[in-house]
Structure formats: structure tokens, C-alpha cells
């Protein structure tokens, strides 16, 4: 199995399976001399960690990260950074019933068709457990980006229920189990998701990621576009079925005069970005960052691991009925919030290093 790495100069390779002894990643391309310890990475992993509310999987993992290489006395050396997270709460017996059955909506069938073998325990390599590695790598990326670039994400929709953007409050993100910026919507979601959970079903969600302080000039025309790399990175997250930048598909409903972000002023003598009248483009024009906030959204499908019987076939081709036991998220979009932040951080760090390599320090 190839394609376990992403990035160009800032390159991340993840490894491990859901029910293996450990998961981890190797981060290559991090410059030397950057302070980095486990304490810098752990808070982000704690945000993604399972079992923190009734609305996420009850699998209990500490997700304690260990730095195995690439630092000396708390500072990066410029060599590959290896990060490891132990798996401690696997329950493989829950998956015995699907060893010879394909779960509808999962990667079981396609993995078997491609490789002729699959690890059915918790989905193996296709499990969202792998995203813990991305979150760890994302914290290394944030150290490269520095404090001037802020990357934050929020859940803006669960199923048919969206937020009221007039109530958007970043301080509410950590005050509820949904990473929701609208406290009223968060209360409504709790009632709705309880109903979904008690039925043994699941529901999808939309995550919005906003990166502020991104300098102008990141990205390149045509095949090196910043937005195409962001879209690819976000689409690679488990269960993601759609990505949009800025207004995305809503841009198709606008006229040219409404969609074009007017440029109101050039930078003053103190520097800073150009001033725009709007940000329909999501901070990227022609594949290159404009200095405005970079805005992306991605849609997460409902997990197919549900207690409601579904029709399928077994490896022998015979019809079967599948009920997925085990511990699963009723809405995987919740824990995708820190994953989205991490992937945006990795892409921005990669493009920042690529820009420096071509143009030198700005």
C-alpha cells in the first residue's frame, strides 16, 4: 500500500492501524532550531481524543504522544521527527462478525478488491484512528508557521441543523462538546444527536476552517495552487465527501459584481495586507493567497457503522445482513474539527517553506 505521505518540503507520512499496537507519523522537512516538546503537541491530541462525551465513540484512548527522533534538548534538529501514539483500548472481538462481510458504506469492499486482504478490526488503516497522527503533525506545522498565523475551526452544521452566523462566538468553541460557535445551536444539537444516538444511527456534519494572518503570496499558478492543495488535504480526511473554498458552490448563485472582492486600499507604509470589501474568494486568488483570511469548509458523511441492519454481501458473494457492533461516533464530524485545523496547518507550512525556497524570506 503506497500513498501514505503528503506534502512537498514539509512532508508527513503516517503509519499504523486502528487495532495495532501503535500509530504514528514521521514529519520530514521541519527546519532546525524550533522549540518542540510533547507538551506542545498533546493539547491538540486531547481535543481530538475519543470518549470525551456521549456524542463521540466511547473507546478510551489516552493518545499520549512520544517524540522518538528529530529533537535534541527540546529543539528540532532538522532531521525526521518520528511521533508515536500507543493504542491501548482496542476491542477486536467486536468485529468478528464482519470478518467475512462487507460493511455498506465502508472501505471493506474496495480494500479487498484492490489488495485481496483487509484488516477488518476497526477498519484497520481506513479507520479515523489514523487522524490522530495528522493532528500531531499539524502541531509541528503550527510551530513552523509561528504565532502570527492563527488556524481555527468550528462545526457549523450537524445534519439539517446549521448555526446562526450572527451568534458566532469563538469563545464558545471549547464550551460545548461540538466545537460549535453558536451556543443556541449547540443546545439544539445535543437534543437532536441524542435522538440519533439512541436509534443506533448516525448523522453528517460540516466543518469550517479559518486561517488568519496568512501572508500574501503562498501558492503558485495552475498545478501548485494553494486552494487545490487544501482541497486535496481536506478530502483525504476519513468520511469527507466535499470541500469548498470561500463561498464555494454558493458562488455559482452570485453575479460577477457580487462575487468579485473589491480592493479598497493598498498597504500603508507600515505594511500589512491589501484591504478588500468582502472575502467571497476565501483568501485565495489564482491559487495564491491574497492576505485575507483563508476560509475552507468540508462535509463529513454519516458514519456507516450503525446498529440498524443493512443489506450487503459476504466475501463468498452471498447476501448477508450487517449490523456494526463496537464503539462508534454518532457524528464523526465533531472530532474532525481539530483534524481539519491540522491539515490546513500542514498545507500552509508546506507552502510557506516552498515560498521561502523560491523567493527567500519576505
Swiss-Prot record:
Transmembrane segments: none annotated. Its EC number is 4.2.3.5. Pathway: Metabolic intermediate biosynthesis; chorismate biosynthesis; chorismate from D-erythrose 4-phosphate and phosphoenolpyruvate: step 7/7. Belongs to the chorismate synthase family. HAMAP family: Chorismate_synth. Homotetramer. This is Chorismate synthase. It comes from Granulibacter bethesdensis (strain ATCC BAA-1260 / CGDNIH1). The gene is aroC.
Amino acid at each position: 500500500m503506497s500513498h501514505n505521505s503528503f506534502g512537498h518540503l514539509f512532508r508527513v507520512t503516517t503509519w499504523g492501524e486502528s487495532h495495532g499496537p501503535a500509530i504514528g507519523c514521521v514529519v520530514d522537512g521541519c527546519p532546525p532550531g524550533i522549540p518542540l516538546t510533547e507538551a506542545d503537541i498533546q493539547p491538540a491530541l486531547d481535543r481530538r481524543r475519543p470518549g470525551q462525551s456521549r456524542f463521540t465513540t466511547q473507546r478510551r484512548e489516552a493518545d499520549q504522544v512520544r517524540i522518538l527522533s528529530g529533537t535534541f534538548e527540546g529543539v528540532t534538529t532538522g532531521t525526521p521527527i518520528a511521533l508515536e501514539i500507543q493504542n491501548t483500548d482496542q476491542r477486536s472481538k467486536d468485529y468478528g462478525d464482519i470478518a467475512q462481510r462487507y460493511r455498506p458504506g465502508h472501505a471493506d469492499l474496495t480494500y479487498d478488491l484492490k489488495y485481496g486482504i483487509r484488516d477488518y478490526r476497526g477498519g484497520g488503516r481506513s479507520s479515523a484512528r489514523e487522524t490522530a497522527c495528522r493532528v500531531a503533525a499539524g502541531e509541528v506545522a503550527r510551530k513552523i508557521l509561528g504565532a502570527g498565523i492563527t488556524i481555527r475551526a468550528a462545526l457549523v452544521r450537524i445534519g439539517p441543523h446549521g448555526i446562526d452566523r450572527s451568534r458566532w462566538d469563538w469563545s464558545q468553541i471549547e464550551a460545548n462538546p461540538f466545537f460549535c460557535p453558536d451556543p443556541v445551536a449547540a443546545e439544539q444539537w445535543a437534543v437532536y444527536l441524542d435522538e440519533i444516538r439512541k436509534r443506533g444511527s448516525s448523522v453528517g456534519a460540516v466543518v469550517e476552517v479559518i486561517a488568519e494572518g496568512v501572508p500574501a503570496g503562498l501558492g503558485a499558478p495552475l498545478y501548485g495552487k494553494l486552494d487545490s492543495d487544501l482541497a486535496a488535504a481536506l478530502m483525504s480526511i476519513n468520511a469527507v465527501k466535499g470541500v469548498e473554498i470561500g463561498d464555494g458552490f454558493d458562488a455559482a448563485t452570485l453575479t460577477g459584481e457580487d462575487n468579485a472582492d473589491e480592493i479598497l486600499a493598498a498597504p500603508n507604509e507600515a505594511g500589512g495586507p491589501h484591504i478588500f470589501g468582502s472575502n467571497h474568494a476565501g483568501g485565495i486568488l489564482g491559487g495564491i493567497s491574497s492576505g485575507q483570511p483563508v476560509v475552507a469548509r468540508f462535509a463529513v458523511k454519516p458514519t456507516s457503522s450503525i446498529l440498524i441492519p443493512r443489506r450487503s454481501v459476504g466475501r463468498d458473494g452471498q447476501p448477508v445482513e450487517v449490523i456494526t457492533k463496537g464503539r462508534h461516533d454518532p457524528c464523526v464530524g465533531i472530532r474532525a474539527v481539530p483534524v481539519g485545523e491540522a491539515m490546513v496547518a500542514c498545507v500552509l507550512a508546506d507552502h510557506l517553506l516552498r515560498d521561502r525556497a523560491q523567493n527567500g524570506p519576505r
